[in-house]
Amino acid sequence: AITVHLVDGDGCTITVAPKGFGSENMSRIQMLKPADGVEGFKKFVIETVKLAGSNPCPPIVLGVGVGGSFDKVAYLAKKALLRPLDVPNPDPYYADLEKELLTAINELGIGPQGFGGRTTCLGLAIEQMPTHVAGLPVAVNVSCHVTRRASAAL
């Protein structure tokens, strides 16, 4: 997919993020109810990893989107995979949620290649946007341990 963002200036930045489909097949989207709240959100993210098991070649990297609409939340999850692992969400609430989910996922014990252990997920990034009061869209984009990206400015 090609996504274009128009910004001020006279330059262009191109980012490429090749991704295997084994991990893509483990990605999920869910239109939660607002009453599900943050607990429902966390449950869905953790359940996604649990259901994936060894299929996405863990340790994995997760991009999580929340908010927007059906199409936007999937975009947010994919966009989250572009954020470097050592850069938390700028919103302290979501940064704390990233840490909490990473800990919970690593406590699942799936481990590298599904052989067990404490390193199931190398990193997790959440991207969010406002949504309609009647919905709580959530998407989890799963990527394997060789998550990679490259950017060039022209």
Identify the role of each PLM range.
Residues 1, 5-64, 69-154:
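Non-transmembrane, aqueous-exposed alpha-helical and coiled segments at domain scale
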